[in-house]
């Protein structure tokens, strides 16, 4: 039996919860185009994101540790893949559209500049008087304008729901700005669970990378209630955590967070009588959530990571280096645009110098930014 697009949509209609986003009900694309024979609209979107230059570049962009620090630390790409996996698990358990959750997860960090959140803060400061910079908006700009792969239009021509999910991405570190995407309404539940999948992924893998790097000591974990309780349940001695024990611990922490979100979200859906996508959109607060207790524990964990990992002197030095590199590059490009590659110079004529420089720098990998700095400022650079 062949699973055509029509067959896939029919199976989706039967299998999904009444409040899920069905691909058959999408608001469609900005530019009309033929449907795929064997893919739903959201599956087609996922494949388009996967093949972008911006997605490939995530491999060499910082999560916490700069790419050259080691091959085994998470990058922005491995983080994205982990978010997509968690999002699919949450969507499957809640009867939601896995394909929509996956593509929003895959696209949510496309607009991140080099050097992680430090790079974003620097670009936001540099662009404050020139239209600003926000990585969610930059992700949307990439998929609607900067990627050029089709003769009839710029961008990827993704469905409305995927674009909405990108621009309304929201975590404790990301605040959405969705002027053109019904900002008064909540996004789909699929997009909401991506927000939590993002938090779940970085809570677990930043903790893992912090321990692996030695910047966090296993004994410090006892300061955090949820970690202390989990270690007791697993009968692990946090003062003597072996490499194998660490892997078990992180895996169980991931499972704990995912299970809690499924149970808490399902409970509020039932309690509030959510029976349609419209109910999801009009609900005053996000439906996807942790339980109250675990939510408080996750806030404590985030505070612990901020104080002990993100503000560790080793990471602070990386941040200072990133700030210096990006500020000097921005200054050089804007004061002497002739330094820019021809394509960027053309973009500057069309869209303005500062926006073109911002797009160029936001698209850089950590390695490219450092190499570019050396080419411009190292007297022996080539």
What are these regions (language model features)?
Residues 100-129, 135-136:
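Aspartate-rich (DDxxD/NDxxD/DxxxD) Mg2+/diphosphate-binding motifs
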Residues 67-78, 91-92, 107-114, 127-130:
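Short coil/turn segments at secondary-structure boundaries
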Residues 1-80, 84-90, 97-99, 119, ...:
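Histidine-centered, transition-metal-coordinating active-site segments
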């Amino acid at each position: 039996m062949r699973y055509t697009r029509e067959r896939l949509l029919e199976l989706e209609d039967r299998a999904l919860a009444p409040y899920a986003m069905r691909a058959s009900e999408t608001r469609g694309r900005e530019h009309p185009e033929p449907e795929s024979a064997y893919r739903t609209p959201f599956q087609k979107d996922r494949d388009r994101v996967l093949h972008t230059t911006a997605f490939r570049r995530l491999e060499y962009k910082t999560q916490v540790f700069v790419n050259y620090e080691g091959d085994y630390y998470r990058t922005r790409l491995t983080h994205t893949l982990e978010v997509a996996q968690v999002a699919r698990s949450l969507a499957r358990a809640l009867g939601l559209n896995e394909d929509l959750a996956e593509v929003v997860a895959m696209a949510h960090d496309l607009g991140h500049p080099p050097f992680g959140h430090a790079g974003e803060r620097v670009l936001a400061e540099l662009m404050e008087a020139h239209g600003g910079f926000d990585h969610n908006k930059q992700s949307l700009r990439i998929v609607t304008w900067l990627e050029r792969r089709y003769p009839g239009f710029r961008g990827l021509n993704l469905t409305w729901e995927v674009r909405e999910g990108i621009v309304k991405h929201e975590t404790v570190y990301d605040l959405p700005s969705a002027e053109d995407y019904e900002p008064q309404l909540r996004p789909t539940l699929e997009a909401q669970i991506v927000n939590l999948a993002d938090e779940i992924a970085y809570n677990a893998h930043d903790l893992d990378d912090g321990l692996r790097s030695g910047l966090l000591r296993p004994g410090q974990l006892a300061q955090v209630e949820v970690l202390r309780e989990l270690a007791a349940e697993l009968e692990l001695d946090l003062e003597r955590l072996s490499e194998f024990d660490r892997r078990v611990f992180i895996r169980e922490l991931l499972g704990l967070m995912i299970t809690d979100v499924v149970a808490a979200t399902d409970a509020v859906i039932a309690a509030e009588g959510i029976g349609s996508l419209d109910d999801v959109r009009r609900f005053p607060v996000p439906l996807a959530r942790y339980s109250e207790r675990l939510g408080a524990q996750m806030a404590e964990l985030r505070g612990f990571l901020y104080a002990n990992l993100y503000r560790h002197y080793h990471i602070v030095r990386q941040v200072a280096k990133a700030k210096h590199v990006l500020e000097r590059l921005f200054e050089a490009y804007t004061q002497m645009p002739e330094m820019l590659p021809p394509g960027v110079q053309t973009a500057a004529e069309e869209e303005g110098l500062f926006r073109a420089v911002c797009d160029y720098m936001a698209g850089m990998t950590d390695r490219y930014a450092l190499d570019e700095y050396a080419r411009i400022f190292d007297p022996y650079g080539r």
